[in-house]
């Protein structure tokens, strides 16, 4: 039997990092303020990165830092300076896609693994063997690979070389995220972390011609072209492999990667908890996993998501993998609070969404139980007065319920 896979979660800031670990992640990948292909994310300051590494290692978890831009000449000295810093704080690995950046990493990083980012578009075993010879420890394979292709890759590479694959989250409609649409429309390059997501915009086909017109640019027409690989500019469903943990493990994937460094705390907690439970159930009792699939599917839909697809894992996806009529998410539960403190009667938190005395809320426990409880009393901490609801963002509140949560538990709507 293949080994138990690593569960790898994204984190956009230190709070989501702690939540990811609390709810079951074995490792997290994060980005600094530069070089990480997520310019819109809050990202981690240098001090945050050090704190993240220290926190992860204190809790026997791993931390991977992204440095996966395609560097231009004016980035090189900054990359060198950044890697000197990473060499001090010692993350477990750095993710890289650019070979110049790889060369700098080999020169400057000691005791830090190099992982090849999915941006490198790795689709065959010869590439992976080449990266191993250069000194890489792991490759994040392209999303465009099927499980059969991944299985074949595993059969042609060293046992020491690890394969990481995205198994849940948003999918880029362009090949391995190498998109120029954002750069063309707005001057902001996806390959430098500035993607404005034109693939999610609404477009019209004018007068039944095969021309593309974006709503805000009625005078600009673009001919629609499609080849055997499909069209590159429409709205993809989200990837979800929660029903196929057995096939992922059988293919030999070493690390199950979740997309979403810009996703919410509730999303990270929900997805981490569901995949943690599914992986553990499968490893411990395959029948238990199969019997719980409906429960996993129900739970994974309690965070915000687009309709789900299995992507390329079972062959090239057809038109059902895209969403043609809208770009909206399906809304799940609302995040009310994350418990900061507990005493004999009350628990304390900073409000995330409004709720009221008398409401029934749900505690997301770490052991996969969803515990319904009624709000009996609510006190504004700053005024010390009883209130009927908490309508203000970041309002500091303590409440009494008939069941007490634990520190770090998430409170959400039913």
Protein language model regions, located:
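Glycine-rich, positively charged N-terminal anion/phosphate-binding segment
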Residues: 38-54
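Conserved nucleotide-cofactor-binding alpha/beta core module
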Residues: 125-126
């Amino acid at each position: 039997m293949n080994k138990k896979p690593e569960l790898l979660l994204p984190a956009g800031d230190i709070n989501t990092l702690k939540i990811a670990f609390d709810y079951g992640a074995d490792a997290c990948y994060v980005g600094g303020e530069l070089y990480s292909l997520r310019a819109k994310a809050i990202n981690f300051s240098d001090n945050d990165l050090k704190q993240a590494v220290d926190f992860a290692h204190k809790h026997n978890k791993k931390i991977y830092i992204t440095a996966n831009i395609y560097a231009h000449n004016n980035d090189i000295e900054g990359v060198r300076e950044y890697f000197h810093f990473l060499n001090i704080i010692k993350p477990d690995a750095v993710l890289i896609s650019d070979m110049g950046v790889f060369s700098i990493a080999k020169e400057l990083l000691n005791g830090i693994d190099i992982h090849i980012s999915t941006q490198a578009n790795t689709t065959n075993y010869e590439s992976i063997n080449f990266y191993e010879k250069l000194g890489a420890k792991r490759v994040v394979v392209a999303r465009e690979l099927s499980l059969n292709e991944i299985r074949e890759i595993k059969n042609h590479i060293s046992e020491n070389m690890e394969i990481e694959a995205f198994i849940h989250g948003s999918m880029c409609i362009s090949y391995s995220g190498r998109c120029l649409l954002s750069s063309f429309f707005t001057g902001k390059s996806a390959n430098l972390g500035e993607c404005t997501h034109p693939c999610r915009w609404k477009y019209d086909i004018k007068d039944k011609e095969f021309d593309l017109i974006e709503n805000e640019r009625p005078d600009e027409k673009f001919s629609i072209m499609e080849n055997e690989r499909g069209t590159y500019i429409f709205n993809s469903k989200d990837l979800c492999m929660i029903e196929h943990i057995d096939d992922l493990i059988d293919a030999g994937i070493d690390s199950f990667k979740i997309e979403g460094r810009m996703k919410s705390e509730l999303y990270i907690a929900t997805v981490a908890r569901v995949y943690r439970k599914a992986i553990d159930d499968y490893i411990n009792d395959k029948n238990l996993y199969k019997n719980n699939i409906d429960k996993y599917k129900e739970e994974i839909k309690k965070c915000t998501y687009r309709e789900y697809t299995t992507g390329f894992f079972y062959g090239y996806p057809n038109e059902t993998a895209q969403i043609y009529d809208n770009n909206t998410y399906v809304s799940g539960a609302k995040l009310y609070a994350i418990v900061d403190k507990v005493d004999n009667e009350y628990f304390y938190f900073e409000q995330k969404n409004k709720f009221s005395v008398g409401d029934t809320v749900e505690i997301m426990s770490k052991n996969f139980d969803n515990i319904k409880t009624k709000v009996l009393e609510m006190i504004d901490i700053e005024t010390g007065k009883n209130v009927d609801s908490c309508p203000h963002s970041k309002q500091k509140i303590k409440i009494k319920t008939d069941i007490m949560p634990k520190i770090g538990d998430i409170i959400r709507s039913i």
